[in-house]
Amino acid sequence: MKSLGVYLKHYKKESIIAPLFKLLEVVFDLLVPMVVAQIIDVGIAGNNRPYIVSRFGILVLMAAVGLCCSFTAQYFAAKASVGCATELRQAVFDHIQALSFTELDTIGTDTLITRLINDINQVQNGINMGLRLLLRSPFIVFGSVVMAFTVNVKCAIVFLVTIPILFVAVFGIMLVSIPLFKKVQAALDRVTGMTRENLNGVRVIRAFCREEQSVADFEKSNDELTCLNEFVGKISALLNPLTYVLINIAAVVLIWQAGLQVNIGSMQQGQVVALYNYMLQIIVELIKLASLIITLNKSVACAERVSGVLAVPTTMNYPAKGGAAKKVTGDAAVIFKNVSFTYAGAGAESLSDISFTAKRGQTIGIIGGTGSGKSTLVSLISRFYDSTSGEVLVDGENVKNYTKEELCNKVGVVQQRAVLFKGSIRDNMKWGKEDATDAEIWEALTTAQAKEVVEAKQDQLDFMLEQNGKNLSGGQKQRLSIARALVKKPQILVLDDSSSALDFATDAKLRKAIHNLEGNTTTFLVSQRIAGIRQADQILVLGNGTLEGNGTHDELMKTCEVYREIYFSQFPEERAAYNNESGVIA
């Protein structure tokens, strides 16, 4: 919570002016009953029309000034709350960008979206209402008591007895409801996550006829959220009737006491009206205060959740100064030295004691069963994750010694799930190199076998992509993603099963074009198909996180049982022709 106060400090002036103008408005509100009392006791009782008109003019003037004060307070409160929320949202987004994949996996995408949008909006609403009403309501209540004492001390005692009881009731309910609002927000996170999952997987759900099960699962989570909301709502709903009962009892006692004072001549009728108006003001302000407390409870709960995200430390730190990229020694592009890796919260290692060397210009194929650690291995090269033990070296330097920019310039990554952003094809291609020329873009598109895809579009490079490239096929998105990585001409290219949606002919052309790239580009090909990596200079065979084999295709056919099993599962007709003695295909 304290960490969030930093963002409100940037709006000190607005945070001071808004309550001050609200308090100025309160002063006029407190004077109104006294003016009304004068109209009754002096003007009406004495049939003094000029006096009534003059006091009515004063009331109109006070209303106009109070309205101006209210508008001014609202303006500065809105400026402070919106500005604070904007800076807070930017800070959270920047912090998310700095988090490693480990923290992102732990927190979850749905939770981060909720924190970034819903929770910060709730914080903004709380700041706005707090600056306007947090001082106004108590000041009205306290001021009404003081003004009541100036009218009649005996009647004012009713106020002194009533106010503490009301505060105990209001704040007692507040203390009970705050923890419950946190549970409501947690339940909302679950519903949001389920909604996102179902909408993203709607085609799979329909393909397996799981609509009824999905509806049932969502209904269960939604019912849990509803029950929590109803329970909290019932507790919060006690505020208004409870305050009304207490205030109405106090009003009855007040009128009875005031009537006695009028009968003995200690008070006038206008003063009774003034006291009752002060009691009504207290009723209105306590109702506002009750509503404000509910809003602030939600805002505090949301602020704590947002603060929790900001408090998550990033485990991935980059050096402040570069220089590692200049230290190129030897012909080894990538070296893994006894590398092991375990995902946060996982019981077993995903990679265990992996060691190999990839030389410049080589093509490294990586194959293995599902969950064998293929994607995990290549993600360590680009430092999406840090190894649990061992070292990952790029150009002879530990990846931890590179700045983020240096490593990003060296390594181009195309992941299995192709992600394109809303905008033109040209804009997406320039993610790899901001100053890329059209010639460079077309060169990359040609290598990625995406040239004909772009040429077929009416606007070609200016063709507008929808969010996540929804107006393209899966294969087209993969080819454009590969082209985006090729634009910056990386020294190391990682293709993480990124051609899975391509047909065999296009895939073969793509592999040939990448193999013929100019320069000493080291390419890592993660694939489920041996045909895609068969010609690689070196093939890594993974099984349950361990390196089962390392060598060329022919070498692995002789020495690696796991590789042979994968090969024969994809080419069963070759099993009979396999010569066990020579270890080659006949």
Which residues fall in each region the model found?
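Helix-loop-helix
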Residues: N47-G57, M147-V161, F231-E304, V309-L310
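ABC-type nucleotide-binding domain
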Residues: K327-A586
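Short intracellular "coupling" helices and adjacent cytoplasmic loop segments at the cytosolic face
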Residues: G46-N47, V82, Q90-T114, N118-I120, ...
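Membrane-integrated ABC transporters
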Residues: M1-D29, V36, I44-L59, V65, ...
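Transmembrane helices of ABC transporter permease
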Residues: H10, E14-V27, Q38, I58, ...
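An intracellular "coupling" helix at the cytosolic face of ABC transporter transmembrane type-1 domains
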Residues: H10-K13, A98-T102, N118-L131, L135, ...
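ABC transporter TMD-NBD coupling linker
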Residues: L199-R203, A216, M279-A346, D386-L393, ...
